[in-house]
Swiss-Prot record:
Region (G3): 448-451
Name the UniProt record assigns to this protein: Translation initiation factor IF-2
Keywords: Cytoplasm, GTP-binding, Initiation factor, Nucleotide-binding, Protein biosynthesis
Biased composition (Low complexity): 213-223
Function comment: One of the essential components for the initiation of protein synthesis. Protects formylmethionyl-tRNA from spontaneous hydrolysis and promotes its binding to the 30S ribosomal subunits. Also involved in the hydrolysis of GTP during the formation of the 70S ribosomal complex.
Region listing for G1, in residue ranges: 402-409
Name of encoding gene: infB
Region (G5): 538-540
One Gene Ontology cellular component annotation held by this UniProt entry: cytosol
Keyword Protein transport part of the UniProt annotation: no
Family: Belongs to the TRAFAC class translation factor GTPase superfamily. Classic translation factor GTPase family. IF-2 subfamily.
Region feature Disordered, mapped onto this chain: 31-87, 94-113, 129-285
Pfam family, one: EF-G_D2
Higher taxonomy: Bacteria, Pseudomonadati, Chlamydiota, Chlamydiia, Chlamydiales
GO-annotated molecular function: GTP binding; GTPase activity; translation initiation factor activity
Amino acid sequence: MEKAKLTKNLKLKIKNAQLTKAAGLDKLKQKLAQAGSSETKSSSEKPSTKVPEKIAKEKVVKKKSVVDPGVPTMTEPVSAENSPRRIRAKNHSSFVSEDLNSPQPPVPVDSDASAFSDSAVVEEVDSFVETEQEISVSTPPPPVTEETEVVAKEPPAPKKEPEVVVKKEPPKSVVSIKSNFGPTGKHINHLLAKTFKAPKKEDKPAPKEKTKTTQTKPQQSSDASNDKHHSPTNRTSQPFYRRDVSKKSGSDFRDRAKKDDNPKAFTGRDRYGLNDSSDDDKWRKKRVQKTKKHYEEHAIQRPTHIKVPLPITIKDLAAEMKLKASELIQKMFIHGMTYVVNDVLDNETTVQFIGLEFGCTIDIDSSEQDKLCIESNTVKEEIQETDPSKLITRPPIVAFMGHVDHGKTTLIDSLRKTNVAAVEAGAITQHMGAFCCSTPVGNLTILDTPGHEAFSAMRARGAEVCDIVVLVVAGDEGIKEQTLEAVKHARAANITIVVAINKCDKPNFNADTIYRQLAEIELLPEAWGGTTVTINTSAKTGEGLSELLEMLALQAEVLELKANPSARARGLVIESELHKGLGAVATILVQNGTLHLGEALVFNDCYGKVKTMHNEHNQLMKSASPSIPALITGLSSMPKAGDPFVVVKNEKTAKEIVGARLAGQQKFALQKKRPNFDAMLQNKKILKLIIKADVQGSIEALANSILKITSDKVSAEILANSVGEISESDIRLAAASKAVIIGFHTGIESHAESLIKNLGVKVQLFNIIYHAVDAVKEMMTALLDPIAEEKNLGSAEIKETFKSSQLGTIYGCLVSEGTMTRNQKVRVVRGNEIVWKGNLSSLKRIKEDVKEVKKGFECGILLEGCQHAQVGDILQCYEVIYHPQKL
C-alpha cells in the first residue's frame, strides 16, 4: 500500500513539474536554485558519517537537476580506495533501520525536488532488501559540465574494513544540459520514427557490431511503469552515471515494430480512409505513376521516286509517299477531285499527277499484272506475229442477225437441212447457237443470234466473234428496230455485211422498198451502184440459197482468214449453262490454235480441265481446230457468255492465276450495295425478284429487259440470279426477302415443290421472254395503290328532323336529283362546305325499308354517326370506284 501511494504521489509530482515548466515557472525556480547554492557554499562542512558494517552495497545518491527536475544528475559513487569490507544484509528490518538512522547531507533544492528525491531513495532501499550482492562506497567525483559517454568498469575487489569515513565536500552547482525527457523517461529522439535509407542492391549493408555494454537502470526511476519490465532481481551493482542524451548507448531502441518487407496491399478501404491510420503496419502503397514517353520527332525523309501497282487506294498511296491520307485528300479536293481514304485509284494519270503535286515521281509497277495477264495481245495480233508458213486457212464464222420473226433460224435450217425452228418456244430463238455446216463451197461456222430486243448483248458478242454478218431482212416488213441495232454492232466490229432479203415468195414482197431503206442507213446496194451485197432468198422454197453460199465463200477469200493450229488454243465462250449430271458446261468457239482433251483452261474468274468435248450433234471430239465450236465439261464454275479463254500449262497454274484475280477483285470490290436514296425519298415501291434460267445468256437478257422497265412509282430489284433449276435455297431466300421467283426455260426441283406451298412463295415459269417481261410489269402495277374516284348518284334536301331515343336523329328528305341508294357514301353539304362524310345506314319510305329512292319522292334517312345535320342541308349520295394505276 505504501508503495502504491508513493507511486501515485510520484506521478502527480512529475505532472506538476511538467505543468510548471509549461507555465514558465522554471526561470523562477532557477533563480531560487542559484540563491540556495550560494548559501550552501557559505555553510561549514558536516562531519563524515560512518557506514554500517552490515551494508555491503555501494551507496548511490542521486541529485535532482535544478534546471530540469525530470532529468537525473550524474551519480556520485564512493571511491574504491575507501571501500569497506563486504558484509551481508541479515534481514529486512535491520537493513532499513540502519539506513534510516544514518545521517544524510542536506540537498539545496526546492520542495518539489526534495520530495521527489526522498521518495526515490525510499523506493531504492526497498528494492535492495532481498538482494545479496556486494556493494562499495566511494567518494563522489567532482561534477562535470559536459556529458560524456561512460562505460561501466568492473569494480575492484573490496577490502574488508569495519568502518569507512566519507568526507563530503560542499556540492557545487552542476550545469546540466536540458534534455527533452518525457514522462516515460525516454528521450524525444528515441520516440520519433527513424528513417533508414534502403541500401543499394549491389552494396550489402555491413553487419552491426554488438557492443557488450552493461545497460543499467537508475535506482530512482522516474516512472513506476518501468518496474514492470525491470524486476529488482535483474538490477546490477555497477555504478550508474547520468544518461548521455546526445548519444545512443547499446542497441538501437525503436518505439515501434520493424516494418514488414512485404506490406499489405493497397485496398479500396485505404482509398476512402476507412482503415486505421494510426496502425503503423498499415501504410499506403504509393502508386507507380506511368510516365509519358516522349518520342523525339525525327525529320521524315519523303521519297522522290516510288513505284506502285494499280489499282491502289488513297491510304496505300499515302503510306508509300510517307504522307498522311488527309494531305492527299486535301490536295485532290483543291483540284476538284473528291475522294475518301478507301477510294481506289486506277487511273495512271491521276496517280502521277498526285505525285507531282508533292514532288514525287511515281512509276506504275505492272509486274503483278504481267503474271496474271497470260494473253498480252489479241488473237488477231497473235496471228499476225506468227510465221506465215505455220498458218492455214480456216472456215469463216458467219453470224445471222436481224429482227425477230424475220426468218433467220428457218434460213439456217435450210442451209443445214435441219428443222431447228420447229422446236423453238414461241417460234423465236432465245439462245445463241453455233453450228458447223458443210456446203458445196466449203465448211461454214454459223452463229444463230436472237432477234428479240432483250438479246442485245448476245448480238453484240456474235458480231465481235464472227467474220461475216448476214443481215436478214423480211421483204414484206422492211427494216425494223433490231435490224438497225445489228447494223450498229457490225459496224462497231468492222465486219463485212451481206444483206439477205428473205421471204421473197410472199406476194407483198417489195425489194425496192428494202433498197431505199438500206440506202438511208448508208448501206447502198450493188443494184443501185453501191458495195453492199444483197440477195433475195426464201427459206421455204430454197430460192437464193446457193447464191448466198457463193457470196459467203467469195467474201471469205477476200478476207484471207488464217490461223495457227499448232499454237495454244484461244477463243470465246458462246454460251454456258448448268447441266444436271455434267455440272457447268460451256459452248466455246476456238479462234486460234487447237484445243485437246485434258488441257487446262483459264477464263476470267474460273478455270477448268477439259474432260469431255462434243459437237452440235452430241458426238465426242478429241480436238477442236480453229473456227470449230465445241461443248466442253470439267469447269470449276460457269463462265460468263463472252469471256475469253486460253490454255495454260497445267491445272495448278490455272488455279493460281484465277485465285490471284479473285483476290484482287475482292480487295477493291464494294462490300455493301449503296441504298437507293432516290427511291427512299420518293417513297417508291420495290418489286424484289429472283431469276433462274437455263443458260447465262438468258439471265442476262431477261435481267436487262426487266431493268429497262422505268416508272416513277415502282421499280424492280433483282436480288439474285443463277443458272439451273429452282432449288430449296432459292425458295428460302424468296420467303425471307418477300421476293418473287421468275423461272425462264427451267423447272423446279422435285423436293422443293412442297416447300413452295409451305412458305407461300410466288413462283412463275416462262418459256418466252416477252411473256416474262409482261408478267413483271403486271406485278409492278399491282404494287401500286389504286386511284379512288367518287361518282355522284343523287342528292336530297333535308326538310325535317326527328329525334329517336333508340336510333338517334332521323332526317326527312326530298330527293332533288338522281337516286338515293342505301349502304352508299353520303356527304352533308352546308352552303359550299362539306361538314360530314359517312355511310347511309337506313333508307325508308312510308315506314318501309327500301334500297333506293328516286327523284321527286320523300324518304327518311338515317346517317351512321351523324347528329349535327340541319334543316336545309344537302345530302349527296356517291359511290367510290377504284382504278388501277399505270406505270
